[in-house]
Amino acid sequence: YAIIDDTGVGGGVTDILNREKIRQKLNKLRVVPVNFSSAVPDKEAAGRYADISTWMWAVLRDMAASGLLHLPDDATLIGQLTTRKYIFSGAPSKLKLESKEALKKRGLTSPDRADAVALALYEGGIFDVHSLI
């Protein structure tokens, strides 16, 4: 599986991987595009989270808090995971991650490593991550 952030520049990466998959006859490769502004695919979670990225980060948080996920001792990753704020947005009120634009206004960079971990945990009908533990 290649789970790709399909938002912005990632869309081009998804296209290239799909072309190479066909060209090289990589029939077992599954390219999974994830648009971080999409709706939450889990119906129950959709009532609590504003978008798929917020939901993915919440899954990451819950897995780490429960001990199912052990993160590396990586100061950049830990910093990215702990500095991004949440807000409540909309009606009914749903949890939403602080936007990357708001992060930039606070002088912070895009949380690329944290997003990569969230993507690595993305189930999206692919497999049950708990079966790997």
Enumerate the predicted regions with their spans.
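Acidic two-metal-ion nuclease catalytic site recognized across multiple nuclease folds
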Residues: 78, 82-133
